[in-house]
UniProtKB/Swiss-Prot annotation:
B6-vitamer kinase involved in the salvage pathway of pyridoxal 5'-phosphate (PLP). Catalyzes the phosphorylation of pyridoxine (PN), pyridoxal (PL), and pyridoxamine (PM), forming their respective 5'-phosphorylated esters, i.e. PNP, PLP and PMP. This is Pyridoxine/pyridoxal/pyridoxamine kinase. Its EC number is 2.7.1.35. Gene3D superfamilies: 3.40.1190.20. CDD domains: pyridoxal_pyridoxamine_kinase. Homodimer. It comes from Escherichia coli O139:H28 (strain E24377A / ETEC). InterPro entries: PdxK, PM/HMP-P_kinase-1, PyrdxlKinase, Ribokinase-like. It comes from the Bacteria.
């Protein structure tokens, strides 16, 4: 068989369950560098679309790389359709975005994609910053999230700081955070999972709050003191995997949190500064 025939036979194209759009590092375990192996451990096929390509996170003493140019980024997305690789697509997840223009490009692609995939699950992790660091993305990204991605998402996973930025509301206590999350719900946006919500410091607990139109569920987990990066990316990878494997939202959130704790403890046992995935036990 000639190579020309082989590579133009779209019936032979690889298919993805998930397209994951976020950062990638050469060294380390953040963004798609941790999300992709975590998703694959769950038996799902995933295509990774980078928004930034970095040598490593900026926490090291040397750091190289930057945002993917818009022309490349739009080409990566377009190529997935040109290869006919999205026939079985079930979900798109987003994490760290490099520029506001990337967010607009992605939103346009998702809008077109949904015409062929009306049941597509779009889950957005609106990476903006945190309480300790403040905003650590470009200043025009929060508005781009509000304008372009939130109207398309079925679920979002902000931390408390990001929820405050997106809503303009104070979220430092549980009731106000829940009210802020509910203000974002719409006919499209069905749920908000607030990560790193206020927990019980004395009992070494952290809380994840699952907010939908008709329910609020507070899930408590043990707090692990660590400076490890990529735990939020891992959480989202586990969450989307659980949902696609048929878990109910609250159960998927609970299991994702437990898996993150397991990975953090395993990483600490192996004295690594970067997350290490242990084998995934069948659940």
């Amino acid at each position: 068989m000639s190579s020309l025939l082989l590579f133009n036979d779209k019936s032979r194209a690889l298919q993805a369950d998930i397209v994951a759009v976020q950062s990638q590092v050469v060294y380390g375990s953040v963004g798609n560098s941790i999300a992709v192996p975590a998703i694959k451990q769950n038996g799902l096929n995933v295509f990774a679309v980078p928004t930034v390509l970095l040598s490593n996170t900026p926490h090291y003493d040397t750091f190289y790389g930057g945002a993917i140019p818009d022309e490349w980024f739009s080409g990566y997305l377009r190529a997935l359709q040109e290869r006919d690789a999205l026939r079985q697509l079930r979900a798109v997840t987003t994490g760290y975005m490099g520029t506001a223009s990337q967010i607009k490009i992605l939103a346009e692609w998702l809008t077109a994609l949904r015409k062929d995939h009306p049941d597509l699950l779009i889950m957005v992790d609106p990476v903006i910053g945190d309480i300790d660091s403040g905003i650590y993305v470009k200043p025009d990204l929060p508005e781009a999230y509000r304008q372009y991605l939130l109207p398309l998402a079925q679920g979002i996973t902000p931390n408390i700081f990001e929820l405050e930025i997106l809503t303009g509301k104070n979220c430092r206590d549980l009731d106000s955070a829940i009210a802020a999350a509910k203000s974002l719900l719409s006919d499209t946006l069905k749920w908000v999972v607030i990560t790193s919500a206020s927990g019980n410091e004395e009992n070494q607990e952290m809380q994840v709050v699952v907010v939908s139109a008709d329910s609020v569920n507070v899930i408590s987990h043990s707090r692990v003191k660590t400076d490890l990066k990529g735990t939020g990316d891992l959480f989202c990878a586990q969450l989307i995997s659980g949902l696609l494997k048929g878990k109910a939202l609250n159960d998927a959130v609970h299991r994702a949190g437990l898996r993150v704790l397991e990975v953090m403890r395993y990483t600490q046992q192996h004295e690594s500064d970067e997350l290490i995935l242990p084998p995934l036990a069948e659940a």
